[in-house]
């Protein structure tokens, strides 16, 4: 049985996992660095990289022992090779490539975002294509997931990522790190309508998002309040989370319309293997304008007749650390249901950074013989569209 070993080190969690060709997670080890970074109220890249260097050997021993696996049984080694904090990415990638060289097994460089994008295929075995909202500490984007390595970004944040905004607001409120879970916990105790915060570019008519203005509004409110007690913190957390939900819900509706346009307007419904033709949009424009676009061959995918019914897949996936927020899951589920879509979020432990998603992305690439050279250069920035 094929076994893929995955390594994740793009931020502050050192993670190694082993999965089988049948998508069974044999072991999924995560060594957290929260204690090291909590005193700073955020992740310190240098500390993160040094901790990865110290933790990887032990994480490998733990994952092999827990999965009852010998290193010689590993079929391939997959590792996050970007995007992320470059120090940690280099450490994890070098560790993986060393294993690959020593074991004479294939090395597979994985885009961290692709790991998140494919997690629902690991947990729920969904088919391509589907619409994805990737919401994490470093990214927030709507993506049409058309196939392995075939991604179309429909919209993205033009400033701060949503997860980063959660963490920074939590820090303003003197809540512990990481801030996302703390905001969610406090929000349950507060009044979501106590404070009205701005919803930047919510009516722009496209899928792009902005969170910096919201963050500034929260900071201004806190500075102007005479007292910030527990009750006030709860109300701010609830109002902030409510506003995030409203922004994402509005943008989700824009994303659904654009996603349908991509799948319907450019699909040739004929009686033999067909092509889905996607049009690129100009990078310097927020609005997608098909008539001004040129065809990009990398966004053509061939679909067999047996998959025709899946072309209008009724699934929307939310992934990334922010996807673990139950309130946002409920809000987005209510938003997508009238459009005939079901919302899927991976289990909480697979929403946040983990190596099982990296191993699974590696498995899909292994099955398609998409291997990477040992001199693959890790990347701090790496768009899904550039895989």
Swiss-Prot record:
It is found in: Cytoplasm. Keywords: Acyltransferase, Cytoplasm, Iron, Metal-binding, Transferase, tRNA processing. It is an enzyme of class 2 (transferase). Its EC number is 2.3.1.234. Its cofactor is Fe(2+). Fe cation binds at residues 112, 116, 353. It catalyses: L-threonylcarbamoyladenylate + adenosine(37) in tRNA = N(6)-L-threonylcarbamoyladenosine(37) in tRNA + AMP + H(+). GO terms for cellular component: cytoplasm. Substrate binds at residues 134-138, 167, 180, 325. InterPro entries: ATPase_NBD (IPR043129), Gcp-like_dom (IPR000905), KAE1/TsaD (IPR017861), Peptidase_M22_CS (IPR017860), RPE3 (IPR022437), TsaD (IPR022450). Required for the formation of a threonylcarbamoyl group on adenosine at position 37 (t(6)A37) in tRNAs that read codons beginning with adenine. Is involved in the transfer of the threonylcarbamoyl moiety of threonylcarbamoyl-AMP (TC-AMP) to the N6 group of A37, together with TsaE and TsaB. TsaD likely plays a direct catalytic role in this reaction. Belongs to the KAE1 / TsaD family. NCBIfam families: gcp_kae1 (TIGR00329), RPE3 (TIGR03775), T6A_TsaD_YgjD (TIGR03723). This is tRNA N6-adenosine threonylcarbamoyltransferase. It comes from Rickettsia prowazekii (strain Madrid E).
């Amino acid at each position: 049985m094929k076994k893929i070993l995955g390594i994740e080190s793009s931020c502050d969690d050192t993670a190694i996992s082993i999965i089988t060709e049948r998508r069974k997670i044999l072991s999924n080890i995560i060594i957290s660095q929260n204690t090291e970074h909590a005193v700073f109220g955020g992740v310190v890249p240098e500390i993160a990289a040094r901790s990865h260097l110290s933790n990887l050997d032990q994480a490998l021993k733990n994952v092999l022992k827990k999965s009852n696996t010998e290193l010689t049984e590993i079929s391939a080694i997959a590792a996050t090779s970007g995007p992320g904090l470059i120090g940690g990415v280099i450490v994890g990638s070098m560790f993986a490539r060393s294993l690959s060289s020593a074991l004479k097994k294939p090395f597979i460089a994985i885009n961290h975002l692709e790991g998140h994008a494919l997690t629902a295929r690991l947990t729920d075995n969904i088919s391509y294509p589907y619409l994805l909202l990737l919401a994490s500490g470093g990214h927030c984007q709507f993506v049409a997931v058309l196939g392995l390595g075939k991604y179309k970004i429909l919209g993205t944040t033009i400033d701060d990522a949503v997860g980063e905004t959660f963490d920074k607001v939590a820090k303003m409120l003197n809540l512990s790190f990481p801030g996302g879970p703390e905001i969610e916990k406090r929000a349950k105790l507060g009044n979501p309508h106590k404070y009205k915060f701005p919803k930047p570019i919510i009516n722009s008519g496209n899928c792009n998002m902005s969170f910096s203005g919201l963050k500034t509004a929260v900071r201004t409110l806190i500075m102007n309040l005479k007292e910030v007690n527990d009750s006030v913190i709860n109300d701010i957390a609830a109002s902030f989370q409510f506003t995030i939900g409203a922004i994402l819900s509005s943008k989700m509706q824009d994303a659904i319309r654009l996603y349908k346009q991509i799948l319907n307007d450019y699909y040739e419904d004929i009686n033999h293997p067909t092509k889905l033709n996607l049009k690129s949009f100009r990078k310097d424009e927020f609005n997608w304008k098909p008539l001004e676009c040129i065809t990009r061959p990398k966004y053509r995918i061939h679909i067999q007749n047996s998959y025709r019914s899946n072309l209008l897949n009724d699934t929307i996936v939310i992934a990334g650390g922010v996807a673990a927020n139950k309130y946002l899951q409920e809000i987005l589920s209510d938003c997508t249901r009238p459009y005939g879509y079901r919302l899927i979020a991976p289990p909480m432990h697979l929403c946040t950074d983990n190596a099982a998603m990296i191993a699974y992305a590696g498995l899909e690439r292994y099955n398609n013989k998409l291997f990477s050279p040992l001199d693959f250069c890790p990347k701090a920035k790496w768009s899904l569209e550039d895989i």
